[in-house]
A protein has these predicted regions:
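Short helix-onset patch at the extreme N-terminus, typifying the N->h transition
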Residues: 7-8, 27
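Short hydrophobic targeting helices and cationic amphipathic motifs
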Residues: 4-6, 13-16
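N-terminal signal peptide c-region/cleavage motif recognized by signal peptidases
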Residues: 51-54
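Bacterial N-terminal signal peptides that target proteins for export
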Residues: 22-43
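Sequence/structural signature of beta-propeller domains
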Residues: 57-393
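Hydrophobic helical h-region of N-terminal Sec-dependent signal peptides
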Residues: 44-48
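Methionine residue identity
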Residues: 1-2, 18-21
Length: 393
């Protein structure tokens, strides 16, 4: 079982010969050790156009659960993320943003655990790392968010044992203040996180109505800006492939392309590779991007093709060939998914309902029969996706 969002394996305080990923974990650990004690102390039109012209038939799966509608009317629900409870996977947490008000926490059945009013939190992403020395090993989870109210990148750091205790005591919630905050020089939009061999814990922060992307990392001094690059146009959805050091990012509006940046220690973003475009398999805006990892460094890149309400699968590895597409259709009790912004997928056995992982998708048009409700998130067993598409596991 694989999970893009956490890295396992004990990390020792003394430096030693390591593989690249272990070096990245060591870099994060070095920062954490110095910070640990302080913790303890304290495009609707485009969518309509492309939906009307696209009549192609695609395989369909059904959501098995959905979350309650978010508190805000209109275009509000946006981006999901997940924390895997490795001690009790069925008691994991789904995070979801209401980009006009804050962050929700849900269980795997879509039931609300908590809601924190934080302002305009647009996108979120997580990484969990097993850190410690010979005497003390703990998992820490890092929750990144793009805060449009304050124009910042926000970062919460949770010790997983404490999170588990709060879940058991029904007292879990995202704190109202982050552990770290970095003031951005752009109008913030989307965000995705990663673990990099050179820079450790990183976050890619995109610009609203602009082409810039900021790259941040966690240091002993807090969140530092590493560099800023030009992605060519407004971008939101992104995902970082830690093992392959590849940033996938969707450019919206005029061009409508999905790009891949294959990186090295120089973090040179000058030569993106075009994975797909509107001339290919993308309808309208490319939006949320996620990874579904399979053994031997294989797996799938998944993109929300928003304009025709489908999800595209590509090979995770270069040259990222398009494989197929699917939709999330309606069941007797849950409506279909359309006009999706953010998505999240992982390959991890969470429960008997999710034997091969999970997919969470924002639903841009949430309905109850003929009645339109506020937006929400739909939850899919990824086994159903693999079965209906008949692709390699």
């Amino acid at each position: 079982m694989m999970n893009q969002n956490f890295i396992t394996g004990e990390i020792h305080l003394g430096y030693r010969n390591m593989m690249n990923m272990e070096q990245a974990q060591q870099l994060v650990l070095h920062t954490l050790i110095n910070l640990f004690h302080s913790f303890k102390k304290s495009s609707i039109v485009l969518a309509f156009f492309f939906t009307t012209y696209s009549l192609a038939d695609y395989a369909e799966v059904e959501a098995i659960y959905e979350t309650p509608p978010v508190v805000t009317k209109g275009d509000a629900a946006d981006d999901p993320a997940i924390w895997v409870n490795k001690s009790n996977p069925s008691n994991s947490i789904i995070f979801g943003t209401d980009k006009k008000s804050g962050i929700y926490s849900y269980n795997l059945q879509g039931q609300e655990l908590s809601y924190t009013n934080l302002g305009n939190i647009n996108n979120i992403d997580t990484r969990t790392i097993n850190v410690g020395d010979d005497e003390n090993v703990s998992d820490f989870t890092f929750l990144f968010a793009s805060n449009r109210t304050l124009g910042s990148v926000d970062l919460w750091v949770f010790e997983d044992n404490e999170t588990r205790e709060k879940l058991e005591n029904n007292s879990w919630e995202v704190p109202s203040k982050p552990s770290f905050r970095g003031k951005s020089d752009i109008i913030v939009y989307g965000i995705c996180a990663g673990i990099d061999p050179k820079y450790g814990l990183v976050a890619f922060l995109t610009e609203d109505t602009g082409p810039r992307v900021e790259v941040w990392n966690l240091t002993e001094n807090g969140l530092d800006l590493i560099t800023t690059f030009n992605n060519g146009g407004e971008s939101e959805g992104c995902v970082y492939d830690d093992l392959n050091r590849t940033l996938f990012i969707s450019e919206e509006e005029v061009r409508g392309v999905l790009k891949a940046y294959r990186l090295d220690d120089s973090f040179d973003f000058s030569e993106p590779y075009i994975v797909d475009s509107r001339e290919g398999q993308i309808g309208g805006d490319p939006e949320g991007v996620s990874l579904y990892k399979t053994p031997n460094n294989s797996g799938y890149l998944i993109l929300s093709s928003q304009g025709d309400s489908k999800f595209n699968l590509y090979d995770r590895n270069y040259p990222y060939d398009y494989i197929t597409s699917f939709r999330i259709g309606s069941s007797k009790s849950i409506d279909n998914v359309t006009d999706t912004d953010g998505i999240e997928t992982i390959n991890y056995k969470l429960s008997e309902e999710y034997p091969e992982g999970i997919m969470i998708a924002q639903d841009g048009l949430n309905k109850d029969g003929y009645r339109t409700k506020r937006q929400n998130f739909k939850i899919v067993s990824f086994k159903d996706v693999l079965d209906v598409l008949d692709v390699t596991r």
